[in-house]
Amino acid sequence: MTHQLKSRDIIALGFMTFALFVGAGNIIFPPMVGLQAGEHVWTAAIGFLITAVGLPVLTVVALAKVGGGVDSLSTPIGKVAGLLLATVCYLAVGPLFATPRTATVSFEVGIAPLTGDSAMPLLIYSVVYFAIVILVSLYPGKLLDTVGNFLAPLKIIALVILSVAAIVWPAGPISNALDAYQNAAFSNGFVNGYLTMDTLGAMVFGIVIVNAARSRGVTEARLLTRYTVWAGLMAGVGLTLLYLALFRLGSDSATLVDQSANGAAILHAYVQHTFGGAGSFLLAALIFIACLVTAVGLTCACAEFFAQYIPLSYRTLVFILGGFSMVVSNLGLSHLIQISIPVLTAIYPPCIALVVLSFTRSWWHNSTRIIAPAMFISLLFGILDGIKASAFGDMLPAWSQRLPLAEQGLAWLMPTVVMVILAIIWDRAAGRQVTSSAH
């Protein structure tokens, strides 16, 4: 007999999914986009919500449909390419960007206002921070219970208070949009949504949500998909409400900070302005705990993944990943964001193509014929977009600037659509040939 979840269990699954997604990036990027977009904040918000909410939820649903992790999702592109994709996802949400970012965000919100942005305080902080991360990651047994029962609700309560405050007590009038947002607010919001890395995170952690439903006795594929979809939608609604409030917070904070300020600085300035020193201390403590929990979760997940393929023990990998993340974190938050933008701009398009096209797998004679070329083309043109967003943008040939949507950082979109159409024609033709030869 198939076990069905009670309403309480479904809500708990939704909260767990929301808590998995809400990390450092989710809190710092919406205020930054809000401040820079100014009067175009809601146009930018729509673009941001597509990549920072829509795509991660879609990824969770796609994983539930195939009943597994990123390895199941990437079946149409083959084992080697699938492993490469999984490795890129784990590196991005692990030691390259997301894990170091947890340290820099908690430092900038809690410590930098007291010490300034000099290198030595960050170095000392990062050594202590990652020593704790490594220690907890070596013995993660009780972490999940602690997170689920105490820290996740605390984090959600703090975010609700912050969101309500942003709406009820705006810091000042809306700022004027930066040049980048005057003509391309939607696409800038869309590309900035990449920076939350939630789609990559969903590929890594989506299986956790599916397994959480399984652990409660749900075995039927149809019900697993349904419950995971509900959990994803609940998390999506929560993220949307949080982001809209944080966009409002950022767009109203022009009188508090410079428009080039990063999200952590905006957040600290607003909380200091609205709640005073005690509020700032509470915010710093909560963000420290939230970031630490995220860092431990990412370190554990990455160590478990790489232990399957590298002849090193889990414990050794925890030390390596923690040490590497510590070194990277000393670049500082603003530099880390600058470096991550070109890389994420390059690797997001093939992930988007894979997730969206995974829903069409049953439509084709051979889904590999559609998905593999679409991902390849989206990666090629995504790399062009990535180079354009980097310091090497001037080295690109003139024709790359004339591609459709190139100005918006979405040069990959039209070539990928064209490739999908050509691949569909090929699949239909090749499929008919196979059938006729069989008879």
Curated annotation (Swiss-Prot):
Coiled-coil positions: none
Membrane-spanning residues: 10-30, 44-64, 80-100, 119-139, 150-170, 190-210, 227-247, 278-298, 317-337, 339-359, 370-390, 405-425
UniProt-listed GO biological process terms: isoleucine transport; L-leucine transport; valine transport
Annotated Gene Ontology cellular component terms: plasma membrane
Residues in the Periplasmic compartment per record: 31-43, 101-118, 171-189, 248-277, 338, 391-404
Pfam families from the UniProt entry: Branch_AA_trans
Location in or out of the cell: Cell inner membrane
Membrane topology type: Multi-pass membrane protein
Protein family per UniProt: Belongs to the branched chain amino acid transporter family.
Purpose of the protein: Liv-II branched chain amino acid transport system, which transports leucine, valine and isoleucine.
PANTHER family associated with the record: BRANCHED-CHAIN AMINO ACID PERMEASE BRNQ, BRANCHED-CHAIN AMINO ACID TRANSPORT SYSTEM 2 CARRIER PROTEIN
Protein name: Branched-chain amino acid permease BrnQ
Recorded name of the encoding gene: brnQ
